[in-house]
């Protein structure tokens, strides 16, 4: 009797283990494992622009099987802005491993940020190690300050275009574009353009239909043409 019970328990354990192994294999084949997600590190500072962060965060953040969002700043702790939207961040120097990609927003804080050598150094280091680098609005001024955009195409907020361009005189600035791709670097125009760029990034990685489906889910009219910014004459 005891031996039969033992055999039954062994059989059940074997079947359970086989089932778990099969589920894990299926999860991996579907790309749903944590190991297959890309970490996007948002590099923040005080006086960041709200939608520069939360627009792309809404798009990438809802795709939990593909992207993981983390938030960092030089000092760590809470960063905020003129809209009084606080975000809890981790300290950049405490980063355990390099992220797959970074996103640098714009905002009034970039005016001080371009003079912050430590911030620029951290952005440069992370940009060099990341597979992709995204900037929104005047965030491209911070990236330009690193020198990594020299001889590359880029764009920025049209209302602050002249100031941003002055931060990278060797950059090939495109005033007409909604967003620009040059290698691993994605730079967008102002504020809401970060959402268009994020959807463009999804289209590049997962296909246009996937990006359109994501835009539809958030009830957003995606400006699909990256070469045509309707706000190009704003400045």
Describe the function of each predicted region.
Residues 173-183:
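The feature captures the short pre-catalytic strand/loop hairpin that immediately precedes
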Residues 154:
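Anionic-ligand binding patches
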Residues 8-15:
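Sec-dependent N-terminal signal peptides
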Residues 159:
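NAD(P)-dependent dehydrogenases' Rossmann-like dinucleotide-binding region
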Residues 184-189:
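A short glycine-threonine-serine/GTX helix/turn-capping micro-motif
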Residues 2-7, 19, 23-133, 141-145, ...:
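Extended, subdomain-level signal for the structured scaffold at the beginning of enzyme domains
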Residues 190-194:
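Short acidic alpha-helix initiation/capping motifs at coil-to-helix transition points
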């Amino acid at each position: 009797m005891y031996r039969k019970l033992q055999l039954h328990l062994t059989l059940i354990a074997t079947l359970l283990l086989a089932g778990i192994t099969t589920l894990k294999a299926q999860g991996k084949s579907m790309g749903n494992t944590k190991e297959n997600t890309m970490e996007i590190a948002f590099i923040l500072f005080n006086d960041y622009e709200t939608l520069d962060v939360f627009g792309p965060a809404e798009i990438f953040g809802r795709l939990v099987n593909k992207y993981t969002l983390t938030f960092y700043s030089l000092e760590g702790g809470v960063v905020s802005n003129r809209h009084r939207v606080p975000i809890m961040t981790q300290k950049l120097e405490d980063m355990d491993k390099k992220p797959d990609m970074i996103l640098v927003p714009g905002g009034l804080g970039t005016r001080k940020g371009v003079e912050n050598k430590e911030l620029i150094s951290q952005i440069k280091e992370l940009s060099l190690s990341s597979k992709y680098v995204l900037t929104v609005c005047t965030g491209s001024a911070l990236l330009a300050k690193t020198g990594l955009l020299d001889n590359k195409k880029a764009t920025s907020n049209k209302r602050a275009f002249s100031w941003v361009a002055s931060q990278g005189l060797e950059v090939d600035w495109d005033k007409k574009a909604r967003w620009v791709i040059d290698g691993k670097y994605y730079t967008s125009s102002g504020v809401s353009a970060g959402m268009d760029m994020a959807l463009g990034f999804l289209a590049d990685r997962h296909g246009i239909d996937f990006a359109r489906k994501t835009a539809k889910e958030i009830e957003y009219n995606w400006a699909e043409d990256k070469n045509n910014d309707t706000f190009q004459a704003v400045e």
